[in-house]
């Protein structure tokens, strides 16, 4: 089980990703978490807010996966998240869930390209070496 601690509503909570997370999300929302994550990424790229209800479902699913596997109650409820979570905390949670899911499915992370591999864009087709 992959886990990560984040702060939500002033409490440090552990989010986990495993098959139980996907099942819990499906039970809460009657949708596939992969679809939510795709929508959340699209919202973030357009700098709009993803559906808060589905963000809360995803957070609760990740908390339940961790705390119930340990026989413990989750430290936050959906009501706590709706009423007390700051937008930045919800954003952090979305990125955390995306990262955990990528790690769970072994999705390779892109490597930044070295500056030397960037094609020359000068009009003459020659490199500008900074000479006058």
Protein language model regions, located:
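Charged interaction scaffolds used for protein-protein
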Residues: 1-12, 32-47, 57, 69-132
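Short capping micro-motif at the N-terminus of alpha-helices
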Residues: 15-17
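Short, surface-exposed, low-complexity cationic segments
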Residues: 19-38
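Short, solvent-exposed helix-helix connector turns and helix-capping sites enriched
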Residues: 29, 47, 51-52
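Elongated alpha-helical scaffolds
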Residues: 53-61
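Amphipathic alpha-helical interaction segments
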Residues: 62, 66-70
């Amino acid at each position: 089980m992959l886990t990560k601690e984040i702060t939500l509503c002033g409490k440090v909570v552990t989010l986990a990703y495993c098959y139980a997370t996907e099942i819990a999300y499906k039970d809460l929302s009657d949708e596939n978490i992969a679809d939510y994550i795709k929508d959340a990424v699209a919202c973030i790229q357009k700098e709009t807010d993803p559906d808060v209800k589905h963000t809360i479902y995803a957070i609760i699913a990740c908390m339940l996966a961790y705390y119930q596997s340990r026989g413990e109650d989750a430290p936050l409820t959906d009501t706590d998240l709706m009423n007390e979570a700051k937008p930045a905390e919800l954003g952090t949670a979305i990125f955390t869930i995306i990262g955990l899911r990528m790690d769970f499915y072994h999705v390779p992370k892109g490597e930044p390209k070295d500056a030397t591999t960037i094609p020359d864009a000068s009009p003459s087709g020659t490199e500008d070496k900074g000479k006058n």
